[in-house]
């Protein structure tokens, strides 16, 4: 994170206005502006583990990664700068949580790209901190208001669930495929055969649907699940618990916190980071898998058919095969052999 995002560049146009402010940064924090912004004091709260990794190097204990912010995260802050994400329910969850903790009279700034739907912040906060647009540049909008009324926030009210093949899937705002099983994951699930054994790592686990489905017909698997998203980690834990399944679930930036080797790695890797298309996560997943697969271990991923994963798979493992496909998606399989580039 060296270059600033367009949203941060818009904020920097107003940097003189924040010199005396005690700021909490939250939302989609895709650069290190919170660590470098000139103000009286700065804190940050994020639900994204990879954002916490970057910011914690410079901000230390003044940045926290968790599902929900606590009173200690907003201590002494008089200003919120919220970076609008592309997911509206995620924004509502985070804003209701944080504004329920901020003192009345706090300044509230919301900034984001126009295409992300940042304009809907006006309606969302109308009853709590009526917003006015104060700048428009770099295809972004910057809005300001003052907190007039603290919203009520209860985490329990934000949980949702759906059922698939007798399994209960627990979800939260910001979790991939929150409202039901996505087509890509469904295709990957169709390739997982009963009686699978050994250690299985589910990277980018989301709500835990892949692992739950696998364990339901392969009770001898030993599951490990990880995701960069705090809501995903908590949703996966809840999904396993709801179905009487066991597994280790933790936050990790792809393999950053993963230890040991596995007999199978499964994933429906993301190819967006915020509003931007990015293959970085999938490339890190494929190239890093060789350090986390046992000999003969298998990597199985699903991806949009147009993405250039075959080239990366062949460069890393020496071969790949397509074991299922539709018009939009393909499931790729490769195996850890001596020719894989460790």
UniProtKB/Swiss-Prot annotation:
Record-linked Pfam families: MTS (PF05175), MTS_N (PF08468)
Enzyme class, spelled out: transferase
UniProt catalytic activity: guanosine(1207) in 16S rRNA + S-adenosyl-L-methionine = N(2)-methylguanosine(1207) in 16S rRNA + S-adenosyl-L-homocysteine + H(+)
Similarity field: Belongs to the methyltransferase superfamily. RsmC family.
Recorded name of the encoding gene: rsmC
GO CC annotations, alphabetized: cytoplasm
Quaternary context: Monomer.
Protein function: Specifically methylates the guanine in position 1207 of 16S rRNA in the 30S particle.
Bridged cysteine pairs (disulfide): none
CDD domains: AdoMet_MTases
Protein name: Ribosomal RNA small subunit methyltransferase C
Keywords, ordered alphabetically: Cytoplasm, Methyltransferase, rRNA processing, S-adenosyl-L-methionine, Transferase
Highest taxon listed in the record's lineage: Bacteria
A GO molecular-function annotation: 16S rRNA (guanine(1207)-N(2))-methyltransferase activity
InterPro entries reported for this sequence: DNA_methylase_N6_adenine_CS, Mtase_sm_N, rRNA_ssu_MeTfrase_C, RsmC/RlmG, SAM-dependent_MTases_sf, Small_mtfrase_dom
Keyword S-adenosyl-L-methionine in annotation: yes
The protein's Enzyme Commission number: 2.1.1.172
Keyword match Amino-acid biosynthesis: no
